[in-house]
Amino acid sequence: MAKKVTGMIKLQLPAGKATPAPPVGPALGQHGVNIMGFCKEFNAKTADKAGLIIPVVITVYQDRSFSFILKTPPAAVLIKKELGLESGSGVPNRTKVGNITKEQIRKIAELKMPDLNAATIETAMSMIEGTARSMGVVVVE
């Protein structure tokens, strides 16, 4: 018989650096999940992705066990990593912070493809381009 789901928790955590401190502790504690167990498992699975923010969806079951699914990092994080930026522009319509090429966008789109609601790589690329523009990054050919 399948386990009964009692909760779904969505978090964005730095890869390999989950600790029982907020936001992890309070989010999992209210569902009665073993916080250290989650932190150890998450850190082990994301150790190779250091420096990235990893979204995770945690499913909590009635017997207080859990399972989690790792998603791909947000597009904005991947764009900042690709261009070596600290942050995007506060006023993207006036201040531009960098340039990104179509090849770099294709690389990010291919990485994000499993989590994007896009049928083709071209639509995924246009989504990533929109994110880049809203960060103050100019898309060049």
Swiss-Prot record:
Pfam families: Ribosomal_L11 (PF00298), Ribosomal_L11_N (PF03946)
InterPro entries xref list: Ribosomal_uL11, Ribosomal_uL11_bac-typ, Ribosomal_uL11_C, Ribosomal_uL11_C_sf, Ribosomal_uL11_N, Ribosomal_uL11_N_sf
Gene3D superfamilies associated with the record: Ribosomal protein L11, C-terminal domain (1.10.10.250), Ribosomal protein L11/L12, N-terminal domain (3.30.1550.10)
BP term (GO), one: translation
SUPFAM superfamilies: Ribosomal L11/L12e N-terminal domain (SSF54747), Ribosomal protein L11, C-terminal domain (SSF46906)
Coiled coil ranges: none
Post-translational modifications: One or more lysine residues are methylated.
UniProt record similarity statement: Belongs to the universal ribosomal protein uL11 family.
NCBIfam families xref list: L11_bact (TIGR01632)
Protein name: Large ribosomal subunit protein uL11
Organism: Clostridium perfringens (strain 13 / Type A)
Lineage, highest ranks first: Bacteria, Bacillati, Bacillota, Clostridia, Eubacteriales
Recorded name of the encoding gene: rplK
